[in-house]
């Protein structure tokens, strides 16, 4: 049966990628359908109960700046907030929150159900309908057909998912949910390049069976941070601490004695796991010289006794899991509520994607999230928003939005995926961004909200708040650059208190703010300082960063300007690189395989040398000269 309503965009999967994709397309005015095998699991946190972290928090802020839901839902469901790297420079500071699973999921569900232009439907998708080289819709498990010119596939770990506990295994998308076997088979038939990856999760513990008195308590920050640019600490529910304990030599002995029962080390699991979130057995094997590893006990919520022991993800048999847990200080009598497990799943080579996250081989079909080889809620949400927005733009006949590496961590993420591919689950870090000084958490809105407004992602409330903030920054910056501090009007004691030494001559307040030890608040406390100082902490933060890091930021912007020419020089999509004289066979093969969109992308493909880039530039120049000559003769 064909469903009577025709949609503009269909999103398959209701995880972090799918929910952001559906919300984005609907905000842009497209009739959007979100299909999930179970509406009750929309926005579910399948693994750890936390959002953010180094690099990841930057992505969450960018999603928020573009009108996405993740940051706001975290503010409503977050039960502990911290700023990581708070003592370091602003480029690497990152927000991280523990979230109440129930509250977070409810916040996402509320937004989905109240979003205009968005329809929800509970059915597993078994098939894609394709006409020629374009997707035309999907078919569910009961044979119900939905039609749309754009489909965003966000299948997570469900494609041919296989759960392992010891040497036992069974098909599942995650614990308690069925896998997407028919859909996985259909994608194989479409000849999309694919592979297998693996991830895992630790056993969950009952807090009532844990001795927290022997552990180190880890409270959240005070004052409590917020994630969304529109958020406030008043939105947060009650705050809870986390606790830290650690493994010991007995723990490690138990693991080593049972590695032959591990599906990872017995050859049962073929998929590659995440390097930066390894299982406890992988840690013991890879870091054999360490006799202890930290374990962080994270509460799952305000209304449950369930504890997430971050650091002991494992797929060992249950009896070994129990022995591991009870060898750890404070967990000697711990009761396991759910066993840990590993899950293998299909992913598709992201080098088969355009910068818009549309597949190169099937028009209108977009991939986002773990299907592209990434790991993490935040990476999924960012891809989902971009894929949903670009699906909507395509339906509306508008040009795709492909953020550059110097514009957003989202640009870094997508560029890494489509030019380099993945050999293991990809996780975002600040170190992956060469322009990270200008890609900070604190300025995500200044970088992206105007673009979001242009695309139709940003509503009137967010836009008004953003414009007010931007105007306040510009106004106060201008005032500081024109107001003079005169040493004859400021007592020597105040000069030394604020500036660390006396003023030798009059100076502009903006110049004084450049000094490392000087803050905006301390400057405004000087006698004769401009009246009515700015009180918005977000505005003050931008003033201080602009003053103290302007030289570094200017140098980075010069580097960006040099790189922009390569990023804006496009390569023909149908170019046969065998036609480019001088390229080696190896380079020709790689370029024909990856089909880079720009010279910049080509240069980031492994094995493509500067000499090869020079040959491409010569070819483009000759082509342009030939085209001009033809036009003149015509």
Swiss-Prot record:
Q: Pfam families of this UniProt entry?
A: GIDA, GIDA_C_1st, SAM_GIDA_C
Q: Does the keyword Cytoplasm apply?
A: yes
Residue positions binding NAD(+) = 273-287
| Entry keywords, A to Z | Cytoplasm, FAD, Flavoprotein, NAD, tRNA processing
Record-annotated residues binding FAD?
13-18
Q: Which InterPro entries match?
A: FAD/NAD-bd_sf, GIDA_C_N, MnmG, MnmG-rel, MnmG-rel_CS, MnmG_C, MnmG_C_subdom, MnmG_C_subdom_sf
Cofactor field: FAD
Is Repeat one of the keywords UniProt gives this record? Answer: no
Q: Record's SMART domains? A: GIDA_assoc_3
Annotated GO biological process: tRNA methylation; tRNA wobble uridine modification
Q: Show the SUPFAM superfamilies listed in the entry.
A: FAD/NAD(P)-binding domain
Q: Name one GO molecular function term.
A: flavin adenine dinucleotide binding
Where does the signal peptide begin and end?
A: none
CC per GO annotation: cytosol
Q: In which compartments does the protein localize?
A: Cytoplasm
What the protein does comes down to:
NAD-binding protein involved in the addition of a carboxymethylaminomethyl (cmnm) group at the wobble position (U34) of certain tRNAs, forming tRNA-cmnm(5)s(2)U34.
Q: How does it assemble?
A: Homodimer. Heterotetramer of two MnmE and two MnmG subunits.
Q: Which family does it belong to?
A: Belongs to the MnmG family.
Record's PANTHER family?
GLUCOSE INHIBITED DIVISION PROTEIN A (PTHR11806), PROTEIN MTO1 HOMOLOG, MITOCHONDRIAL (PTHR11806:SF0)
| Protein name from the UniProt record | tRNA uridine 5-carboxymethylaminomethyl modification enzyme MnmG
Q: Which organism is it from?
A: Azoarcus sp. (strain BH72)
